[in-house]
Amino acid sequence: MIKIYDTMTRSLRDFVPLTENIVNMYVCGPTVYNYIHIGNARSTVAFDTIRRYFEYRGYTVNYISNFTDVDDKIIKAANEAGISTKELSDKFIAAFMKDTAQLGIKPATQNPRVINYMDEIIAFVSTLIDKGFAYVAEGDVYFRVAKSNNYAKLANKTLEDLEIGASGRTDAETDRKENPLDFALWKAAKEGEISWESPWGPGRPGWHIECSVMATEILGDTIDIHGGGADLEFPHHTNEIAQSEAKTGKTFANYWMHNGFVNVDNEKMSKSLGNFVTVHDMLKTVDGQVLRFFLATQQYRKPINFTEKAIHDAEVNLKYLKNTHSLPLTEEVSQAELQTYLDAFQEAMDDDFNTANGVTVLFDMAKWINSGNYDQTVKAAFEKMLQVFGIVFEEEVLDEDIEKLIEERQTARANKDFATADRIRDELAAQGIKLLDTKDGVRWTRD
């Protein structure tokens, strides 16, 4: 059985879906005001890998990942560029889809956009006001955190702790609130900002309400898994839980999953340190499959360190797997031996999607394959395991001239003309084709 580390309970829990063999997942997507950075990519790859493993285990996955296209950062960037917020969002949504395609990300079941859910957002906020969980203040609408049961439990905090931290705050917005911790569900319109009409006057939604509405509209009041980066535990996911459960009276998500951060050369990635790396720029020099492999093979909850050496190692390891995949098939292999690798892989991945252990099994299997165990059944199993990591290798097709040289070398060896055989071997090596003579015949890899 698959076990998931649930952030809410801080424990490993058996995964039991609401509906048998179906997984409903909502993963917070990017705010589309710029190209995604390597930290965004880490989250996208981590949850794509988790989705792929669920599918490997036979589940049908409804995978929802949103685009936040109404936000302070988008408004600021659009104003600076002299274009509409929609034009800016459209540009960076297209860039996101292009970049993530190069990372081997499967298309989501749906990618909802905030601008398409404005009526539903207004209705959601109205319900919270009617139930006494929200109040209007000068055109803004705030959520009453004091009415929320176990507020901030997800972040392992108490309301009392947070109130102590918030004491002494004073600004125009705080003065409008009943409690400094109350958060905005709806923001009154400001000059030069996009807005929509509402019962409280023109304005736009707060950040947290957007995900609650899109998740529940598409997947229902309770979902199986809600995921995102560790930075979203508080306040974003905390506030999603508070407002969603206040509206429905039901558990919002049964499992909460959060991926770890990305450091660059052992330092936190930030613009101020000058180590901020976008995927758009990275893909100019690094193959998307290599970057994917680096990100996918680290255990998703742990921080990872992005370095040139780490990328080089990923490239070397991926090349080894590719060469293994391209080996010619052998005679029938012991299915019992194959099963030991399949069982070990499942055991690793069932343990909270431990890709670090899973990829170790993959390399053990590759070593076994290279020792002459590669029939069609083994190849199919190897490919399915690779696909969990988002890796798909195209079949290598040798040029006719190279195939002819290999055949000529085989003939020369059969005739004990070893000088000719060695000459052809050297000629092939110069073209990047490495030959290996085995009991099952000649095998080749491309350097």
Name each region found by the language model.
Residues 1-33, 48, 98, 119-327:
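Alpha-helical recognition segments enriched in aromatics with Gly/Pro capping
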Residues 9-12, 18-104, 440, 444:
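N-terminal, positively charged nucleic-acid-binding surface of large information/translation enzymes
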Residues 59, 133, 433:
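Short phosphate-binding/catalytic loops that engage adenosine nucleotides
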Residues 67-71, 93-96, 106-121, 139-148:
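Short, glycine/charge-rich beta-strand/loop segments that flank catalytic centers
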Residues 81-87, 108, 301-305:
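Short, polar/flexible loop-turn hinges at active-site or ligand-entry regions and domain interfaces
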Residues 97-119, 233, 288-290, 295-296, ...:
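Non-catalytic interaction-recognition regions
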Residues 268-447:
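Structural preference for alpha-helix termini/caps and helix-kink/transition segments
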